[in-house]
C-alpha cells in the first residue's frame, strides 16, 4: 500500500499519489465494513440495542485497531496461525451442524435469498467479487514472495491461497444459510424492511458463528478480525504517508 513499486518504477513520486488515494479509499472502506460486521456480532451476542451502547462499542473497536496497529503487530504475527486454524474449526463445526440437521441439500441448492434480486444480478455480483479477490490474492502472493530465493516459490503460495479462498467461499455461503432466518428476524426488529434485513443478514456472518458456537465463536471472530483490521490500519497509514510525501514533501513520522 505504500506504493513503493509504482513510485520507483512506474508513476514516479507525484504520480504515486493516485495509487495512495485508491488504497486509502479501499482500505478505509474495508476497515469500516469489518468494524460494522464485528460490532453487529457483538451487539447480537450481548443483546445491546441502545444508541449509546452502539456508539461506545464502535468507537471502542476503532480505538482497538489503532492501538494494535501501533503496539500489537508482533503479538498478532505470532498468533496469526492459531487464529486462522481456530476460525476454520468453527466454520467446519457450523457445516457439521448443517449436515447433522439434514439441511445440507437445501443449503447447497437454495436460490437467491434477498427479495427482489434476480439470478443474473446475483451471478454478476459473484463474478465481480471473484475478480476483486483474485486481484488481492495476486497482490498478496507477490508481496509475500518478494524475498523468495526463486520465482517458482510463488506457485505453491498462490495455489494454496486460491484453494483456501474457494473453501472459504463455500464455508461462508453455508454459514450464511445456517443463521439466515435468525439474523433476518434480528435486523427486522431493528427497523429494516424485508430486503434490507435479508441483505444485512447475508453481510453479517458473525451472527451465524455466534448462534453456532456462542462465546467461543464470538471470541474467534474478534481475534480473526483483529489481525485483518490491524493490517488494514497499517496499510492505510502507509498510503496516507506516501500521499503527504508525494504531494507536499511532508514526511509523517508515525
What does each model-identified segment do?
Residues 69, 86-113, 126, 130-133, ...:
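Hydrophobic alpha-helical segments and their helix-loop junctions in multi-pass secondary transporters
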Residues 171-230, 245-246:
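TM-loop-TM module centered on a large, flexible mid-protein loop between adjacent transmembrane helices
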Residues 37-48, 62-83, 140-150, 242-245:
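Membrane-water interface regions at transmembrane-helix termini and the short interhelical loops
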Residues 20-23, 47-71, 85-94, 122-141, ...:
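Transmembrane alpha-helical segments of multi-pass small-molecule transport proteins
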Amino acid at each position: 500500500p505504500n506504493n513503493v513499486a509504482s513510485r520507483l518504477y512506474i508513476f514516479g513520486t507525484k504520480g504515486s499519489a493516485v495509487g495512495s488515494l485508491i488504497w486509502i479509499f479501499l482500505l478505509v472502506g474495508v476497515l469500516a465494513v469489518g468494524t460494522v460486521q464485528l460490532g453487529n456480532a457483538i451487539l447480537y451476542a450481548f443483546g445491546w440495542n441502545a444508541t449509546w451502547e452502539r456508539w461506545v462499542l464502535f468507537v471502542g473497536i476503532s480505538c482497538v485497531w489503532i492501538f494494535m496497529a501501533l503496539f500489537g503487530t508482533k503479538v498478532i504475527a505470532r498468533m496469526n496461525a492459531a487464529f486462522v486454524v481456530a476460525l476454520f474449526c468453527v466454520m467446519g463445526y457450523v457445516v457439521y451442524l448443517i449436515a447433522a440437521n439434514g439441511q445440507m441439500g437445501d443449503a447447497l441448492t437454495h436460490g437467491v435469498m434477498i427479495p427482489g434480486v434476480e439470478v443474473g444480478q446475483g451471478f454478476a455480483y459473484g463474478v465481480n467479487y471473484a475478480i476483486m479477490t483474485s486481484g488481492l490474492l495476486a497482490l498478496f502472493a507477490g508481496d509475500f514472495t518478494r524475498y523468495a530465493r526463486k520465482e517458482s516459490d510463488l506457485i505453491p503460495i498462490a495455489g494454496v491461497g486460491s484453494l483456501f479462498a474457494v473453501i472459504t467461499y463455500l464455508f461462508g455461503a453455508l454459514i450464511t444459510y445456517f443463521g439466515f432466518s435468525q439474523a433476518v428476524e434480528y435486523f427486522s426488529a431493528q427497523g429494516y424492511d424485508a430486503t434490507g434485513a435479508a441483505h444485512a443478514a447475508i453481510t453479517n456472518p458473525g451472527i451465524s458463528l455466534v448462534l453456532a458456537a456462542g462465546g467461543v465463536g464470538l471470541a474467534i471472530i474478534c481475534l480473526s478480525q483483529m489481525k485483518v483490521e490491524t493490517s488494514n490500519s497499517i496499510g492505510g497509514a502507509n498510503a496516507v504517508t506516501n500521499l503527504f510525501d508525494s504531494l507536499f514533501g511532508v514526511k509523517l513520522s508515525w
